[in-house]
Amino acid sequence: MRPFEDVVAEHGPTVLRVCRAVIGPVDADDAWSETFLSALRAYPDLPADANVEAWLVTIAHRRALDVGRANSRRPVPTESVPDHPAVRADPATGHPDLWAALASLPVKQRQAVAYHHIAGLPFAEIAELLGNSPDAARRACADGLKTLRSIYREDAHS
């Protein structure tokens, strides 16, 4: 079995992008941390032939929803909001409008697009995560992409 540090190094960026797509950039780091804490506990029992990336995306999906629910119950102080976000090595910094457009999609479409195009999961695994059929996952992804294309065309003409 590979050292867990190697798993984090290889799959960490994908997990962060999935967390970001599910709950947004503000809470994504917390969900990422929770994902790898949970994964670390379960990693010794993971079968050798398991798809590690799919396993991590499943955990990330669940932890992101947990973090989002927990944070939605907490008050947010507005006085401490910085004027400008911190610049980090994040692929979203080059395309903030893409992440905003993705966040505007209905939940199942957003998740299907993120899991397929960001995490690279097949529709059968996406269907398990979303609790629907592979055809429904494929349709949600296609509808989400159609909406994203429409939003970008509108932004280009604005």
Where are each of the predicted segments found?
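Arg/Lys-rich amphipathic alpha helix in sigma70-family domain 2
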Residues: D45-A48, T58-E79, P91
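A short pre-motif secondary-structure segment
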Residues: A112-H116
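Acidic, proline/glycine-rich intrinsically disordered inter-domain spacer in sigma factors
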Residues: R2, R74-A103
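C-terminal flanking helix
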Residues: L16, F36, P106, R110, ...
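Structural recognition of an alpha-helix C-terminal capping motif at a helix-to-coil junction
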Residues: D30-L37, A50-R62, R139
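Helix-turn-helix DNA-binding module
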Residues: A103, V107, A119-R139
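Short, charged helix-capping/linker segments at alpha-helix termini
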Residues: M1-D6, L16-E34, Y43-A50, P134
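DNA-recognition helix of helix-turn-helix
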Residues: H61, L65, L130-S158
